[in-house]
UniProtKB/Swiss-Prot annotation:
Binding site for beta-D-fructose 2,6-bisphosphate: 480, 537-541, 575, 582-584, 642, 668, 674-677, 749
EC number: 2.7.1.11
SUPFAM superfamilies: Phosphofructokinase (SSF53784)
The protein's required cofactors: Mg(2+)
Protein species of origin: Aspergillus niger
Protein name (database record): ATP-dependent 6-phosphofructokinase
Pfam family, one: PFK
Activity modulation: Allosterically activated by ADP, AMP, or fructose 2,6-bisphosphate, and allosterically inhibited by ATP or citrate.
Pathway involvement of the protein, from the record: Carbohydrate degradation; glycolysis; D-glyceraldehyde 3-phosphate and glycerone phosphate from D-glucose: step 3/4
Region: Disordered, residue numbers: 1-20
Keyword Zinc listed: no
Binding, substrate: 162-164, 199, 206-208, 263, 291, 297-300
GO biological process: canonical glycolysis; fructose 1,6-bisphosphate metabolic process; fructose 6-phosphate metabolic process
Entry's localization field: Cytoplasm
């Protein structure tokens, strides 16, 4: 029998396959969409392998070419639309032999695999066997020499799609933050019934051998106790747990009790700690009415959150670039993220480290297992311990190291402000410091610092701050007032309350406030104290950081709004919605939201708007709708930052599109306004608030016992904590190389260099806008 016919010469365009394997995770559809569109943009062809490795083994109609329009609307869909399965056949060589044959027949010699460590290991084994598989296919007559000759090299690129976030070498896996969102939503809902009946709840979350979901949900919800596989409790944990819960309820007046347990939790002797066992202990020892809630597969479902949408998109784009960059001898890469930076690392290094963690746990080598988790995991665990056990005698500092720390919010409200304050208060109480909340910003301080019996500066009790764990906005009040309006009164109030340090949470106004205080130190020695800014603003425009608290909450709120608007646009078929985003003169929110919702175009202040740009976009829309005859999901979204242009307002842009459409399609304007500030903070803003606030407290604490002149001489005594690339660091505000002099665009209230600007190109590529012509989309270019 003659072997099946396949192209003797390789196809003109390179063919890249994409598959999703293992357990499904929100964001997998974003990967497929990004790979397909980036491949087409790079003059390649994209093929989807349906049902994971099973589709690769069976071939035929389970390997299909996908075109640009086929993946429209996929970003907002949960699960994986190309299917996933755990394929036992592929684990055996005969199965991989069939898979190799099917790939050659389809002309595919590159594969992007999105799955867990097992799926990625299988992909790397497949690549290592590839030459031998082709040789065997020729020897057995399944294929000819001519058929296999163009496909001697197989390129594999891995993407980690897993809700467990159990892969070493990356801060986050695709789907983990969406899963964390489901958990936090569930626990937030449990709060009300737990409070009403003074009940305890034991909540079991997924994660297998990794405690990331359990740890982050415990931080996000202020859980009283936590069980994770990497750090089993010491013997006698039952007594310790009961003691903490009793103290929280009887001494601190806490009405609800939450215990988070990972499904793989065990003690130091590897005995499983089940949720039912914990419930029995609380019921029998404390006589506490306790319920067990096993969240199960609800943690996998639903649409991807904002973070997983843009992460899957950027990693999918990077995967195609990695395929095109790969050399034959190079190891297969896996695409990872460290803080805000997309990176590549050898796939098998990451897999091996991940498996080593599991082995250490099985060998009771828990310190080694913890050491192999990324530094972020260890920092979060440290922060949780230091903020969940106040008054612990082992953690208290000596009297001469204790400080009076002022805490103030400056600027517009942002998700995470309350959580940062809660973390700071809890850390202060744990270490013996005195946390002093300054209510209603600097104007509140100056007007009411001398009031009686209640003034604007008050000590914060643990009971008060603990209630802020999932509250949005700012409970101590915030506004845009600056100390420069009345420096003398500000200094007088600082002296009255004896502030030893100042913790400022807020946006560009907070940055400006600390700058004013720093510059006034010579005239007012009261300001010769350590001061640090924790950026919190939906605009994400604070110099010294690539991430601000509140920006993720804003993004999630905005994509929910856009998803609903897109549904309306698609139902009306030929309709464009122009949506106005906030963000001041920074286009961060508009750009990242555009990436997360698949916007056709994004207008930002950094690029501006002019008539030529609008004309090109209207032509682009006209061509799109002309090709879309009879297509589903045909609604379009354009995002416009509120300050992109003073002339071309959101309504004007919508009206121009409608006028130029000549009845072929229509447009509407939508302005979500302050809705974008969000309600409850997102889990990412909650956990980063804890981590960053704890780091700020450690930084301020390091100045205890130093003289005023020593503090003023240290450039880091007035600083901003921020994420830069793959690092979290403090940057000095003053000095020749400080943020004020080198990185701040004071006129536009944003950093001089904005890391996210290159994302505009990705938005344009994935919308098809970039391929219209090679002209720049910025009306400021060459101006």
């Amino acid at each position: 029998m003659a072997p099946p016919q396949a192209p003797v010469q390789p196809p003109k365009r390179r063919r890249i396959g994409v598959l999703t394997s293992g357990g499904d995770a929100p964001g997998m559809n974003g990967v497929v969409r990004a790979v397909v569109r980036m491949a087409i943009h790079s003059d390649c062809e994209a093929f989807a392998v349906y049902e994971g490795y099973e589709g690769l083994v069976n071939g035929g109609d389970m390997i299909r070419q996908l075109h640009w329009e086929d993946v429209r609307g996929w970003l907002s869909r949960g699960g994986t639309l190309i299917g996933s399965a755990r394929c036992m056949t592929f684990r055996e060589r005969p199965g991989r032999l069939r898979a190799a044959k099917n790939m050659v027949l389809r002309g595919i010699d590159a594969l992007v695999v999105c799955g867990g460590d097992g799926s990625l290991t299988g992909a790397d084994v497949f690549r290592s066997e590839w030459p031998g598989l082709l040789k065997e296919l020729v020897e057995t007559g399944e294929l000819t020499e001519e058929q296999v000759k163009p496909y001697q090299i197989l390129n594999i690129v891995g993407l980690v799609g897993s809700i467990d976030n159990d892969m070493s070498g990356t801060d986050a896996t695709i789907g983990c933050y969406s899963s964390l969102t489901r958990i936090c939503d569930a626990v937030d809902d449990v709060f009300d019934t737990a409070f009403s009946h003074q009940r305890g709840f034991v909540i079991e979350v997924m994660g297998r051998h990794c405690g990331w979901l359990a740890l982050m949900s415990a931080i996000s919800t202020g859980a009283d106790w936590l069980f994770v596989p990497e750090m089993p409790p010491k013997d006698g944990w039952e007594d310790d747990m009961c003691a903490i819960i009793t103290k929280n309820r009887k001494e601190r007046g806490k009405r609800r009790t939450i215990v988070i347990v990972a499904e793989g939790a065990q003690d130091r002797h590897l005995n499983k700690i089940s949720s039912s066992k914990i419930k029995d202990i609380l019921t029998e020892r404390l006589n506490l009415d306790t319920r067990v809630t096993v969240l199960g597969h609800t943690q996998r479902g639903g649409a991807a959150c904002a973070y997983d949408r843009w992460l899957s998109t950027l990693q999918g784009v990077e995967a195609v670039r990695a395929v095109l960059d790969m050399k034959p001898e190079a190891p297969s890469p896996v695409i990872t993220i460290r803080e805000n930076k997309i990176l590549r690392m050898p796939l098998m290094d990451a897999v091996q480290h991940t498996k080593t963690v599991t082995k250490h746990i099985q060998n009771k080598e828990f310190a080694e297992a913890m050491a192999l988790r990324d530094s972020e995991f260890k920092e979060y665990h440290f922060s949780y311990i230091n903020t969940s056990t106040p008054d612990h005698p082992k953690l208290l500092l000596p009297e001469n190291k204790r400080m009076r720390i002022g805490i103030i919010h400056v600027g517009a409200p942002a998700g995470g402000m309350n959580q940062a304050t809660r973390a700071a208060v809890a850390y202060c109480l744990t270490r013996g410091h005195t946390p002093l909340a300054i209510h209603n910003g600097f104007p509140g301080l100056c007007r009411h610092y001398d009031d009686t019996p209640i003034c604007s500066v008050r000590e914060v009790a643990w009971q008060e701050s603990d209630a802020w764990v999932n509250e949005g906005g700012s409970d101590i009040g915030t506004n845009r007032g600056l100390p420069g309006d009345d420096l003398a009164t500000t200094a007088k109030s600082f002296k009255k309350f004896g502030f030893d340090a100042l913790f400022v949470v807020g946006g560009f106004e907070a940055f400006t406030a600390v700058s004013q205080l720093r510059q006034a130190r010579e005239k007012y020695p009261e300001f010769k104290i350590p001061m640090t800014v924790l950026p919190a603003t939906i605009s994400n425009n604070v110099p010294g950081t690539e991430y601000s608290l509140g920006s993720d909450t804003c993004l999630n709120t905005l994509i929910d709004f856009c998803d609903a608007i897109r549904q309306s646009a698609s139902s009306s078929r030929r309709r464009v919605f122009v949506i106005e985003t906030q963000g001041g003169k920074s286009g961060y929110i508009a750009t990242t939201a555009g990436l997360s919702v698949g916007a056709v175009a994004v207008y930002i202040p950094e690029e501006g708007i002019d008539i030529k740009m609008l004309a090109r976009d209207i032509d682009f829309l006209r061509d799109n709708f002309a090709r879309d005859k009879g297509a589903n999901r045909a609604g379009k979204i354009i995002l416009r930052n509120e300050c992109a242009s003073s002339t071309y307002t959101t309504q004007v842009v919508a009206d121009m599109i409608k006028e130029e459409a000549k009845g072929r399609f229509e447009s509407r304007a939508a302005v979500p306004g302050h809705f974008q500030q969000g309600g409850k903070p997102s889990p990412m803003d909650r956990i980063r608030a804890l981590r960053m606030a704890t780091k700020c407290m450690l930084h301020l604490e390091s100045y205890a016992g130093k003289s005023a002149d020593e503090i003023a001489a240290d450039e880091l005594s007035a600083s901003v904590i921020g994420i830069k690339g793959s690092q979290v660091l403090f940057s000095p505000m003053g000095g020749e190389t400080g943020l004020e002099a080198t990185e701040t665009d004071w006129a536009r209230r944003r950093p001089k260099t904005e890391f996210w600007l290159e994302l505009q190109d990705t938005v344009n590529i994935l919308s098809g806008r970039a391929s219209v012509n090679n002209a720049t989309w910025s009306c400021y270019e060459n101006a």
